[in-house]
Amino acid sequence: MPEGAQGLSLSKPSPSLGCGRRGEVCDCGTVCETRTAPAAPTMASPRGSGSSTSLSTVGSEGDPAPGPTPACSASRPEPLPGPPIRLHLSPVGIPGSARPSRLERVAREIVETERAYVRDLRSIVEDYLGPLLDGGVLGLSVEQVGTLFANIEDIYEFSSELLEDLENSSSAGGIAECFVQRSEDFDIYTLYCMNYPSSLALLRELSLSPPAALWLQERQAQLRHSLPLQSFLLKPVQRILKYHLLLQELGKHWAEGPGTGGREMVEEAIVSMTAVAWYINDMKRKQEHAARLQEVQRRLGGWTGPELSAFGELVLEGAFRGGGGGGPRLRGGERLLFLFSRMLLVAKRRGLEYTYKGHIFCCNLSVSESPRDPLGFKVSDLTIPKHRHLLQAKNQEEKRLWIHCLQRLFFENHPASIPAKAKQVLLENSLHCAPKSKPVLEPLTPPLGSPRPRDARSFTPGRRNTAPSPGPSVIRRGRRQSEPVKDPYVMFPQNAKPGFKHAGSEGELYPPESQPPVSGSAPPEDLEDAGPPTLDPSGTSITEEILELLNQRGLRDPGPSTHDIPKFPGDSQVPGDSETLTFQALPSRDSSEEEEEEEEGLEMDERGPSPLHVLEGLESSIAAEMPSIPCLTKIPDVPNLPEIPSRCEIPEGSRLPSLSDISDVFEMPCLPAIPSVPNTPSLSSTPTLSCDSWLQGPLQEPAEAPATRRELFSGSNPGKLGEPPSGGKAGPEEDEEGVSFTDFQPQDVTQHQGFPDELAFRSCSEIRSAWQALEQGQLARPGFPEPLLILEDSDLGGDSGSGKAGAPSSERTASRVRELARLYSERIQQMQRAETRASANAPRRRPRVLAQPQPSPCLPQEQAEPGLLPAFGHVLVCELAFPLTCAQESVPLGPAVWVQAAIPLSKQGGSPDGQGLHVSNLPKQDLPGIHVSAATLLPEQGGSRHVQAPAATPLPKQEGPLHLQVPALTTFSDQGHPEIQVPATTPLPEHRSHMVIPAPSTAFCPEQGHCADIHVPTTPALPKEICSDFTVSVTTPVPKQEGHLDSESPTNIPLTKQGGSRDVQGPDPVCSQPIQPLSWHGSSLDPQGPGDTLPPLPCHLPDLQIPGTSPLPAHGSHLDHRIPANAPLSLSQELPDTQVPATTPLPLPQVLTDIWVQALPTSPKQGSLPDIQGPAAAPPLPEPSLTDTQVQKLTPSLEQKSLIDAHVPAATPLPERGGSLDIQGLSPTPVQTTMVLSKPGGSLASHVARLESSDLTPPHSPPPSSRQLLGPNAAALSRYLAASYISQSLARRQGPGGGAPAASRGSWSSAPTSRASSPPPQPQPPPPPARRLSYATTVNIHVGGGGRLRPAKAQVRLNHPALLASTQESMGLHRAQGAPDAPFHM
């Protein structure tokens, strides 16, 4: 493959692990000697054959060496380097220093082989695909080019990313984790592998065209590739089937490495990649068998029956010496047997055609062995005794495989409903189940069956076959054996295919083998003997290795069956030992399900092994590599190709052209079949070997981990695995049963998701829910850098409860592999239906694993402010002299359904975040402080308040001083705060001037006509609190000035003062105009007058900012500056900010008087940058300054208590410690929100994030001060805030990229609304924007009658270290103030 690297490889010749390990040496000359040679070296490390395989083109794995090879190749373009002998140079010396451990060498080989593979992919994309697309060199159409290269570009992109991750992994465990995290992304290979036969056919056609053949040859010479394009196109097929082998090799040597902790991850990676390979092989197998079936139909002469496809899948085919229906004597003639799910067809070869000689329906099939001929057996028709055929197999393996499959299919197709035990007895006695002698193997696997009875049923027809085998059943527990056998068979008839897979049931298959000493030979010995814990015959194929794994469960004979089983990954449940069984499983799937119930344990055992075996066998052309198991070797081929049966038969099956070619290609072992690929033969054998040796050892060990993985997937894939109802037992059971599994799974999950250990533990049900949500698109897949894991009691309970103890780890592993295979199958089907492209898998993959089943969408605000750990969207509650403050604050929440306890308000600096509810206006844009709909202000310490935009429920500031009245709101009284009630009908006639007065403990809210903010005296003690608040008053018809700015102007500009200076914005006359974002400069903000259509009304919103602790005068004291709408003012820190009243034909001039009080010099930045609210473009204050946002809303909407009023969706200034506050303008329309607080970056969310980050610094000190200020009500409020904090921290976690525009954020309403017990009517709640996963609303807040808020359970896990740190502090503070559970009163 080095050539793939082409010149590239030259750049990094030495890097290739293969070389480095094997001997960096691998002298250039040597490597060059054979371009392929280098590849081989890389591959060689784990398995020598693998390396040689690489040489054969098929051995994409050979690529690994490419790194070094390319250099050689560049220097020496030899077209066909010598044999892959060089591959085994690995012993040559190690590049540097001490000889690395085996584990390290294997890890390096994985990286190096991946590097070489990526170079080859790049060569395909850039050197072949590019010219063909750009120049139309060969005159190929776009469709032809697509057929030729399929989705090779997606694979190249994905592999490049995988390589980058692998190179950044410093340990073997990290490498395994890369595969676990990206396991789902590998499904893109399915499309490629399925298209490969078509690609190969087209390439062969082109090779017959002189111009095309000439161009390809010239191109190969120019690139100095030793292998033709055909070999390169085969590499992805080879590579995907080798990952699990490489990982198995990694697992084999894990003992040398660190402890067992990382082992679980390695095992999960093995299971995941085995499932991928298994699924791909199964799909290929089905495709090949379908092609083979058509070919047989075409060649068959004398057949007058229906199309052969009516008899199910082609399970096995083979050539035997045999006789006709006459007597027991063998006539020496050759008979071709084609075993379908429902019928055995006997034919004779006549040249290239087949002559029909008879058929026997599987329900009437009788099989008996000849005591005189160890290789002979007889098949007859129970209904027509004369219809019998004496056959002689070529070896014991083949005989065992056929007898097992025939018996299994007989029971699966039997019309009678045979009890499982009866079936087992029949199989053992009537059918002379040789497996009888091999029951011991089965006993090992019993647990497997029990864990996943349903799955077994659906997936284990093959398994059942296992059950039929007497031997295995005995070992399992006599009764289970028979039961599983019965059920599987009974069910099998219904689902022939499942049956086949299950037919792979090792138990049955092997038992027959076991009966005859011969069958016990190769595979039986390995499987049975090793069966108990680890069958690790190095000579075995992947399938055998899987069988070994299964052996742990006690399934030994399954080896052959397994091969068959692999044919149907879909039947993953059927880890049938042989492919034949796998195919058979289709008819018997149903019965297998029934049987599964009876014999869960048994089936599980059988099932687990078969699928793995099959998968591995398929992947590694087992035939060549399975010295120990001749039959198995053939079997692997069988699974891969319809020809596989022939293989079993021996030469004939493998010879079947169409299938064999395809299977060979896919299987590597068959590669030789491809003439154009020079090294194909060696390659094929190599892969097989690698698979065998690798799979056996590693797979067995990781069996548990794989099972765990499978559970995870099942959880992830509700559709398939998630359905564990069928496999439910198995999945949950596995978790419970295998402590190791649970451990593995949690660890896997954790690693997979990159969550902390605490997050690591996830029950299957949780995973299932998360996956379902992702699959359904409820949660955005693209994700969260660090998804938050929220475990729910129900999830945990379900998980543990569902689990059923008793299944051995190997069983669970097998089940997992099967489930994973199903998962991949479903996903592929979905992909194919929707699109044939899975390029976007990577991004969504992680999310899916990480995705929490979180009902609540991420809060836009929270997302926006992931960075601000301190400011979690909670207003710090500062009880100045007003005890009412806290209570009031909660009140708005109460009315506001939107309030999610997650209303994030910046707390630090004691400054609350002013929020504009954008319930109506914002379609879910995040509001820093108040949820739009919730119309909730979270009181913050420092007494600063958020303005409540929601009409129905303004949140009073915690500072007693601020009151926001929304006409829609009834009245929310804070302790010590006057309640202002605005008639629901009144369109907020009142100015709602909200003046924050630092006056001690005095606070009054003007009545409707006027809303005054009372400033709680700002004392140095409250550095955070900035007394001033903005309240947004809601105007009926016309949007009021947002903040102090223009009234009615859709665009309000929040002003923050830096250094205590504030810019006043004059509202522009244009009311329809959306709020324009204002840019703020340094300490001063340039006031922008929002254009108001209406002339500025008399209403003025004076902003008074007082730096330091100086209290503001009483309302009267407030400086009100009425400035023409157009006049922009910049104020010094010390200067009060006047807002230009926006004159507006509002029914009432609504004036928001904001007094900015820099609560304390403490606030880190009194001169915090003003936050500008713009349509969403305005940057929010970066500084921790208290920003209060006031949003005006239309009264009508607000009055309904629907928090959806004209709040500027974006309008949400985040208060920062600086004490400056932002005013947000609200949209003229209650629903419409034109103003968005955005960071300088632009979006409100960003602003919030920024504020939070700003707050982060100062927040710690403010909490203490605020704590001091808290009064009794404050404590309750603080409890509420604590809950809110948790939810917001979660949201923050969700949205680390707080910069996202608010609009894009999930709507507040989405999560909170559903939770509010009594959501106010929302006239026009904006549709929530696309949901994003959010952990923000983990805390549920219920609004009870009387405006009481009581947080529901909040089960959250914060995984961000930063979150944990800052969050813990703030949490501690809140908790000190009061329990979050305390009810809140409006």
Swiss-Prot record:
One of its GO terms (molecular function) is small GTPase binding. The modification Phosphoserine is found at residues 90, 450, 469, 911, 1049, 1261, 1310. Residues 1048-1059, 1073-1086 have a biased composition (Polar residues). The modification Phosphothreonine is found at residues 445, 1257. GO terms for biological process: regulation of actin filament polymerization. It is linked to Leukodystrophy and acquired microcephaly with or without dystonia: An autosomal recessive neurologic disorder characterized by profound intellectual disability, dystonia, postnatal microcephaly, and white matter abnormalities consistent with leukodystrophy. It comes from the Eukaryota. InterPro entries: DBL_dom_sf, DH_dom, PH-like_dom_sf, PH_domain, PH_PLEKHG1_G2_G3, SOS1_NGEF_PH. This is Pleckstrin homology domain-containing family G member 2.
